[in-house]
UniProtKB/Swiss-Prot annotation:
Gene behind the chain: SOD1
Superkingdom to which the source organism belongs: Eukaryota
Statement: the UniProt record of this protein carries the keyword Metal-binding: yes
Cofactor binding note: Binds 1 copper ion per subunit. Binds 1 zinc ion per subunit.
Protein name (record): Superoxide dismutase [Cu-Zn]
Pfam families: Sod_Cu
One GO term describing the cellular component: cytoplasm
Keywords, sorted A to Z: Antioxidant, Copper, Cytoplasm, Disulfide bond, Metal-binding, Oxidoreductase, Zinc
Subcellular location: Cytoplasm
């Protein structure tokens, strides 16, 4: 069992914690989060970005983690970046709390996301269905409101 965590901060009021858990390299990874400071009753893009570099804020995290050179897509799509996690919903207070499992996100092995950055975006991810080049690259999810480098944790 491997556990990892990212503490999200940014230039906005958005902040939170994202936790990752994987039993073994061939198992799905559970991702859970509690994130505050978003707009109320919204959907916000949620992605793993390539670099664990936040020296220039969330911008230096680079593009979505995409080791297979695919187009952007929804988490359930075969054509997607490894780092495409779709949208997280917020409640009436702008809080998002939830979990999902994903077969492409790995904490173990050569495609590990440990040391990369998780990002919450300012807008809704169109899941690559927006009909333009940017949709196929970023999902038109907008600015990077908060981010954190993913590191190994003890629980």
């Amino acid at each position: 069992m491997v556990n990892a965590v990212a503490v999200l901060k940014g230039d906005s009021s958005v902040s939170g914690i994202v936790r990752f858990e994987q039993e073994s390299e061939d198992q799905q990874t559970k991702i859970s989060w509690e994130i505050t400071g978003n707009d109320a009753n919204a959907l916000r893009g949620f992605h793993i970005h390539t670099f664990g570099d936040n020296t220039n804020g969330c911008t230096s995290a680079g593009p979505h983690f995409n080791p297979f050179n695919k187009n952007h897509g929804a988490p359930e799509d075969e054509e997607r970046h490894v780092g495409d996690l779709g949208n997280i919903p917020t409640d009436a207070q702008g809080i998002s709390k939830g979990s999902l499992t994903d077969k492409h996100i790995k904490l173990l092995g050569p495609l590990s996301i440990v040391g990369r950055t998780v990002v919450v975006h300012a807008g809704q991810d169109d899941l690559g269905k927006g009909g333009d080049a940017e949709s196929l690259k970023t999902g038109n999810a907008g600015a990077r409101h908060a981010c954190g480098v993913i590191g190994i944790s003890n629980a």
